[in-house]
């Protein structure tokens, strides 16, 4: 079982984090049938941007089940308005983003995470999608990849959208496929055209993996 929810770099382990690390995540993995392929592509160290399609709120947990390193991820700023909820999701590696505007603070935090050699999990579609398509990726993920120079690891997932079908808990099979890191080295520009092309390649990579699930 892989671990999710390690605290931010330099912070001590909290009781809440320990609870999720040793109890919740293992229980989750034991209840749901998870089939993961391509784990040999997961890097053991160094910065990496993990990109995947987004179907449910529990998607970060699914990635954490097969990723052996702490994950940091963006969450919509509205979730940080409540003090108790804010403390909870921050302890799991989340930081806020304003999805309705260009968020320089979120970009700065993301670059800092990658500069520190950490793992940044991103859902470049921007919102949860319930259909069977991988939608267009926002160009911001391309900008982040090119500005940071961090490897980009594509992942496709399916099944999480059926975990609460019609508001009732379900036990669907969860499938994930991890692809090899993308080569974006030919995109030397730092402009909107290059960022859009990088985002397009990322989307195509995830869509290709999704078609193989």
Description of each model-found segment:
Residues 40, 77, 98, 156, ...:
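Residues at the C-termini of beta-strands that transition into short coil/loop
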Residues 18, 22, 29-30, 44-101, ...:
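Catalytic core of membrane glycerolipid acyltransferases/transacylases, capturing the structured
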Residues 2-15, 105-213:
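Non-catalytic C-terminal accessory region of glycerolipid acyltransferases
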Residues 25-46, 184:
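A short, well-structured juxtamembrane/interface segment
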Residues 34, 69-70, 95, 117, ...:
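Secondary-structure boundary/capping positions in well-ordered alpha/beta enzyme cores
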Residues 1-33:
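N-terminal membrane-anchoring alpha-helices
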Residues 36-39, 82, 104-107:
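Structural motif corresponding to alpha-helix initiation and N-cap regions
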Residues 2-6, 42, 64-65:
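A short, flexible N-terminal coil/short beta segment enriched in small residues
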